[in-house]
Amino acid sequence: MYRIVLGKVSTLSAAPLPPGLREQAPQGPRRERWLAGRALLSHTLSPLPEIIYGEQGKPAFAPEMPLWFNLSHSGDDIALLLSDEGEVGCDIEVIRPRANWRWLANAVFSLGEHAEMDAVHPDQQLEMFWRIWTRKEAIVKQRGGSAWQIVSVDSTYHSSLSVSHCQLENLSLAICTPTPFTLTADSVQWIDSVN
């Protein structure tokens, strides 16, 4: 089972949460995203299982809970990938111009990923950049790694993991799963509010 749920940070961060959870939220700029992620999780799973943190800080359910999840955010958008198949990773990015995106692609993309960029019309290369970037991030996050490891990931390399991508309007969404799964717009659930 794979479940992909998307929502808005600005809406979900104000949603009701189980007792005590709001008090656990960090202060500062990460607070709204943290609250929105917990709101998505508690909406999807009730009651919300205990959450622990891995060596690199990746949140997970306690080992006795046979479910895995990953959260990602970009701008006001947040994504949750939930699975009963094993460790998962997801990444969402708003497709937007980025001043140094070509330099970044040259610094971290593999030869195969560069070939994908070169295969599309120059007008489509920014979208392709975000497609490749989200795939790489999803793989790193599935492994529980840090963003610094993105350079060592080749999203064109065929491994035992399944990597799938979908563009949803101005969003690039990628998931990395331990078993085959094809991400489509129909497999994504949108949450407007949580009561």
Curated annotation (Swiss-Prot):
GO terms for biological process: fatty acid biosynthetic process; lysine biosynthetic process via aminoadipic acid. The keyword Transferase applies. Its EC number is 2.7.8.7. Keywords: Transferase. GO terms for molecular function: holo-[acyl-carrier-protein] synthase activity; magnesium ion binding. InterPro entries: 4-PPantetheinyl_Trfase_dom, 4-PPantetheinyl_Trfase_dom_sf, P-Pant_transferase_sf. It is an enzyme of class 2 (transferase). Disulfide bonds: none annotated. It catalyses: apo-[ACP] + CoA = holo-[ACP] + adenosine 3',5'-bisphosphate + H(+). GO terms for cellular component: cytosol. Signal peptide: none annotated. NCBIfam families: PRK10351.1. PANTHER family: L-AMINOADIPATE-SEMIALDEHYDE DEHYDROGENASE-PHOSPHOPANTETHEINYL TRANSFERASE, PHOSPHOPANTETHEINE TRANSFERASE. Belongs to the P-Pant transferase superfamily. Gsp/Sfp/HetI/AcpT family. May be involved in an alternative pathway for phosphopantetheinyl transfer and holo-ACP synthesis in E.coli. The native apo-protein substrate is unknown. Is able to functionally replace AcpS in vivo but only when expressed at high levels. This is 4'-phosphopantetheinyl transferase AcpT. It comes from Escherichia coli (strain K12).
